[in-house]
Amino acid sequence: MTRAACIVLAAAVLAGCSANNTPRTLYTWGSYEDLIYATYASPGKMPPEQQVEMLEKDYQQARAANRRMPPGWHAHLGYLYYQLGRTDQARQELLTEKAEFPESGVFMDRLLANLERPEPSRQ
């Protein structure tokens, strides 16, 4: 091999190594992980409305990129909808979680059953 060919080959190898080769993950996490951490680290600091807004924005970005949301994402959004009194949307998110992650079916069924029950009156 000539010296010029070796230089060209080395340049091609280095160019290939420097390309953005980060692996594509199975799910789009968006701000979900940070949001969950913030919710548990400082309860009550971030209102459900703000969390819903962040998650809905992440969902729109994921749909635009044809990506999936991670396990628990739809269930968490459903819980937030429930906190806001939007039970129809909560039900839909819990059903979506159950459909996308069948292993969560028993838990989602329990949450859906609780969604149907009226809250006990507080006195």
What is the role of each PLM region?
Residues 11-34:
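Bacterial Sec signal peptide processing site at the extreme N-terminus
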Residues 21-25, 58-68:
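Flexible helix-coil transition and linker loops at the boundaries of alpha-helical arrays
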Residues 33, 37, 41-42, 105-122:
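TPR/TPR-like alpha-solenoid helical repeat scaffolds
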Residues 43-56:
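Helix-turn-helix repeat elements of alpha-solenoid scaffolds
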Residues 76-77:
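Structural register within alpha-helical repeat arrays
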Residues 87-102:
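TPR/TPR-like (Sel1-like) alpha-helical repeat modules
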